[in-house]
Amino acid sequence: MPGETITLQVGQCGNQVGLQYWQQLATEHGIQSDGSSTPYPKDINDLQLQELNNSGSSPQSYPQQTKPNGKYRNDHPELFFTLSDSNTYTPRSILIDMEPSVIAKSTSALPMFNPRNVHLSNQGNGAANNWINGYKYGTEEEETLLNLIDREVDKCDNLSNFQLFHSVAGGTGSGVGSKMLEVISDRYGHKKLLNTFSIFPSNEDTSDVVVQPYNTILTLKRLIDYSDATFVFHNDSLNRIENILFNNNSNIQHDDNDLFLGANKLIALVSASVSNPLRFPGYMYSSMESIVSNLIPTPDLKFLTSSIAPFSTQKHNYLNEYDMLLELSNDRYKTNRVGGDTSYISMLNYLIGYNLDQREIRKGILKSQQRISFVPWVARSVLVVHGKKSPYLKNTNLEGIQVTNNTSMIDVFTKILKQFDLLIKRKAYLNRYYSSVEEENEVMEMFNESRESVKSIIDEYKACKEITYLDDDDEDDLEDGDGGGGGNGNGYNNIDDADMGI
């Protein structure tokens, strides 16, 4: 049986996205805002029940739950929620912030959150968009925060992984988030997977947070050191996707708040969809680790890009499997800006729907392989997983997301490094990060180490574009692992026929 996932949502951005994420999971599993369970809809399509009941999981694999009609239900919310004796669900989530307003809105919108899992600063004045303030606060509250985590771990029968929602550019999400990465890694080591859903700042040279490059580079150092997989979401790209949505729906009236909320929903939908094969199980993946291992061939190449379609527009209502695969590979739908010279290391497509047409999928895989450039040391594998659609969702149209590992990270990190260098060269705003000569030396050392770490990842992604990438001392270690990016070299066998229901 797949293990449970514990979620940490840290800072304003992390908690705003976290709220959308839990609302999405609750909707997919028929859980109301107070944690009570909704019966299966009376008009549920027989095809939906058949798809779920034929998902391939055995009675020994999962604790089965009974439907109102006496049949077993094959969704598994217990991987992300605890179920109380009174049959109410509570997210396996810890909410952390240094000011109360966002968490107050979250707990009001979703009373199912466990109030004992909420941690707020007594001062309530935030981190002032400063990584150091957030990191120091996390250090001071380390024991309290670890107690929250340990208590949630004790509720798990088979903990599989932790996941973190946060921003890399502010104060709390970056600073406290960085500290959480350190303490979880120190406490649980590599026994448990540690994934992050990290929101990156705008690529524009100007920002409301003038110290944004400092915060970002300090956070990246911790992501490089401690995360097992980081899903990158870029504000620029999210806003571009939302603009496409609104432009395709001329009747929708919108403002900047709509774009902001829509961006959070996109992140939440991708994050929820990644775990679809676990929550609505099939044959292909039995754990988050098995999913991640298909995407990350070496520990350093762990920054992932995603794309999503459709967006509830008329244009996308009639996409078949072939069209969906091609749309997912369209750069304009990616949550991180991808240029024309990008090379792919791995690609995993989720097609979520019913009775998928294997012929259309094979055509889509072959066409994608023709269009996409892969690094030379991997097979041109375009992996496809058939995701089961929740019977609680009224929309029965085919949906899809794509997760890839690719060299667009070179441009992302180079831009961050350039912005950092411009500030540090002028020693701009450095006085915000220390108050004494001793602190200054310590902070400058952290900056130097962080810069070197980011530069090393840029070099790693550049090196992976060469055929000689694996010709080093670590080649034997890689061959012993379960890394992705390999596959079998042809698209046909990248579909699991049993999981496709064919």
Swiss-Prot record:
Organism: Candida albicans (Yeast)
Name of the gene this protein is made from: TUB4
Role: Tubulin is the major constituent of microtubules. The gamma chain is found at microtubule organizing centers (MTOC) such as the spindle poles or the centrosome, suggesting that it is involved in the minus-end nucleation of microtubule assembly.
Major place of residence: cytoplasm
Biased composition (Acidic residues): 473-482
Cellular location(s): Cytoplasm, Cytoskeleton, Microtubule organizing center, Spindle pole body
Residues that bind GTP: 169-175
PANTHER family the UniProt entry points to: TUBULIN (PTHR11588)
Domain of life of the organism encoding this protein: Eukaryota
This protein's name: Tubulin gamma chain
